[in-house]
C-alpha cells in the first residue's frame, strides 16, 4: 500500500497528498516533532491506570482523580504558553519537551510503593509540558505554509500525531506483556512440587 501511494503521488497530476507540503522545512520538522509528541503524550494515560488498578489495587474513582491531575496541568500549561508565545515559540517547544522528559523520567522511577501524590505530580508535569509544547509546535509547523494548503497539512499533521500514539502504545503494551511473562517464567522455574515452599499451602496460594 505504501509503494502504491508513493508511485501514485509521484506520477499523477492530482495526487492524494500534495508533495509541495514536504518542501516546507518548518512543516516537515513539525511532522517529525508531532509524531514524537504523539508517542510521549498518550501512552502514559493508557499504561498508568493499568498499573494502578491491577498491581496496586486502586479503585476506579481514585484512578480517575489521579488522571484528572494531568488535565489540570494542561489547563495551567495553556495559560503559561499564552505568555511564552508572545516572546518566541521555540522557547515553548523546548520547555514543553523538557517538562515531558522530566515527567517521563519521574514515572520511570515508579514502583509498587509509589505515593498517589507522586502519580498526580507526574501527571501535572506532563500535562503542563504537553500544553506548552503543543501550541508553539502547531504555530511553527504552519508558519510558512500557504493558506490554501492548510486543510491538507492539518490532516497530515494530526494523522501523524495519532499514528505515533498508536505505534508507541502498541509497543509499550507488547513490552509489558512480554517482560511480565518472562519474569513469571523465571520465578516459576524455582517452584515445583518438590521444593520446600510447597509444604506451606498459604504461600503456594500467594504464588
Language model features by range: what are they?
Residues 177-207:
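A membrane-interface helix-boundary motif in multi-pass transporters
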Residues 13-182:
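12-transmembrane solute porter fold
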Amino acid at each position: 500500500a505504501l509503494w502504491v501511494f508513493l508511485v501514485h503521488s509521484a506520477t499523477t497530476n492530482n495526487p492524494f497528498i500534495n508533495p509541495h507540503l514536504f518542501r516546507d522545512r518548518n512543516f516537515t520538522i513539525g511532522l517529525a516533532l508531532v509524531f514524537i509528541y504523539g508517542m510521549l503524550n498518550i501512552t502514559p494515560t493508557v499504561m498508568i491506570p493499568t498499573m494502578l488498578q491491577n498491581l496496586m489495587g486502586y479503585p476506579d474513582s481514585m484512578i480517575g482523580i489521579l488522571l484528572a491531575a494531568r488535565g489540570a496541568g494542561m489547563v495551567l500549561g495553556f495559560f503559561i504558553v499564552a505568555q511564552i508565545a508572545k516572546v518566541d515559540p521555540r522557547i515553548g517547544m523546548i520547555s514543553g519537551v523538557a517538562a515531558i522528559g522530566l515527567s517521563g523520567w519521574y514515572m520511570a522511577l515508579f514502583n509498587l510503593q509509589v505515593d498517589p501524590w507522586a502519580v498526580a505530580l507526574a501527571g501535572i508535569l506532563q500535562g503542563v509540558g504537553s500544553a506548552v509544547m503543543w501550541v508553539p509546535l502547531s504555530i511553527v509547523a504552519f508558519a510558512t505554509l500557504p493558506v490554501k494548503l492548510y486543510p491538507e497539512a492539518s490532516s497530515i499533521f494530526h494523522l501523524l500525531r495519532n499514528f505515533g500514539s498508536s505505534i508507541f502504545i502498541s509497543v509499550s503494551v507488547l513490552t509489558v506483556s512480554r517482560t511480565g511473562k518472562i519474569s513469571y517464567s523465571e520465578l516459576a522455574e524455582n517452584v515445583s512440587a518438590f521444593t520446600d515452599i510447597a509444604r506451606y499451602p498459604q504461600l503456594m496460594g500467594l504464588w
